[in-house]
Amino acid sequence: MKTNIETAQGWVAGESAATDPAMRVFRGLPYAQPPLGDLRWKPPQPVEPWTDLHAADAFSLPCWQTHSEDAFVWSRGVFERSEDCLYLNVWSPEDADHLPVMVWFHGGAHTGGWGHNLLFDGTNLAGLGVVLV
């Protein structure tokens, strides 16, 4: 089921988690402008607000990193990389008012870390009463 929320940048459309309909998931939310062109090798710049409903129902591509055959077991079949990779995912109970926010930084030693890793599905952890980023 789709779920829409308003952010400082505009409206975002997420969805219910496949394993828990009471859990909202927002995938591929931009947290900075893509570091491309004149922004390459510069500090991240704020995201420009949008006026249309932003679909947050798909993971973004991971950043470029060293290729590791072992890491691809957890890749969900995504083998592409992109410099346009400044996105995050959020798992949240439906009633998230006043819940603590937990930020998870995945590992991977720059050889196999990405937000869409099968091991990093945040549904269960958010179900314990946190908003997981």
Language-model region placement:
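Non-catalytic accessory segments of hydrolases
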Residues: 1-133
